[in-house]
Amino acid sequence: MKKIITILMLILSTLSFAAKKLYVGTNAEFKPYEYLENNKMVGFDIELMELLGKELGYEIKWQDMSFDGLLPALQMKKIDTVIAGMSATPEREKAVSFSIPYVFFEGGHDVIVNDKSSFKKKEDLKGKTIGVQLGSIQEQFAKDNGSIPKLYNNFTEALLDLQNQKIDAVIIAEVSGKEYLKTMKGIKKIDTIKDKLPNASIAFRKTDAKLAKEFSDTILKLKNSPEYAKLVKKYFPEHYDNFIASLKKNK
């Protein structure tokens, strides 16, 4: 009888462990948040989620998909949560819930053009075609600028079209734009758009309030840790001092 009870306990323990798998959706085309390197997903979000998962006892199972498909996949329960450098905009909050922000520094959005163009500032692009990622906040920035947004599955496609002068500009998050400007020829930055949107957060189904709170509480716990500061310094070195100042301000 004792053997049977022991076996049952082992089975239950195994099932309990299996239930701790957390399927996380991301879009690995947004360096330095998440991107592919030697066919492996790396980046700030990837390491942070693994750190959060370790703290909470979850085994993270990654699902890479298109950015505009992330929230629908979450709502359809194909994944459990989303981390993808995503801001908790009012429009998105109608569909899903968010953790507290996990990035604590101000950012902007680069306006990038072909280096042969004569555009000098964002106002020069009124009525012009601007490439943006489908489902991103940059689409609204283009509209607010009086420009015509052209939607792409990812920013790489948009920037390739910009190189070939098929569009007039691309608007992309500053931290990601910086990476493309290092490696892609024939493009240049002419302006920056600042916004008052919240920093990046993790998305959850509205019915998963307990899970969202778990992650929010753990973000609060980790944000002052050496591990967190190390990640910021690794992936956002230019924002490190700003990050430390922001932490002191928000204590």
Where are each of the predicted segments found?
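A conserved helix-loop-strand patch within extracytoplasmic ligand-binding domains
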Residues: 58, 87-88, 100-148
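A ligand-binding cleft/hinge motif common to bilobed small-molecule-binding domains
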Residues: 72, 86-95, 141, 168-196
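Beta->alpha turn/N-cap motifs
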Residues: 25-30, 63-68, 77-89, 115, ...
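Extended ligand-binding regions for polar small-molecule ligands
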Residues: 46-55, 116-119, 123-124, 129, ...
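Short helix-initiation/N-cap motifs at beta->coil->alpha
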Residues: 61-74, 134-135, 150-164, 196-198
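Periplasmic-binding protein-like
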Residues: 28, 104-113, 178-220, 238-251
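Alpha-to-beta junction loops
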Residues: 58-59, 75-84, 128, 163-176, ...
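Extracytoplasmic small-molecule ligand-binding "clamshell" domains
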Residues: 19-86
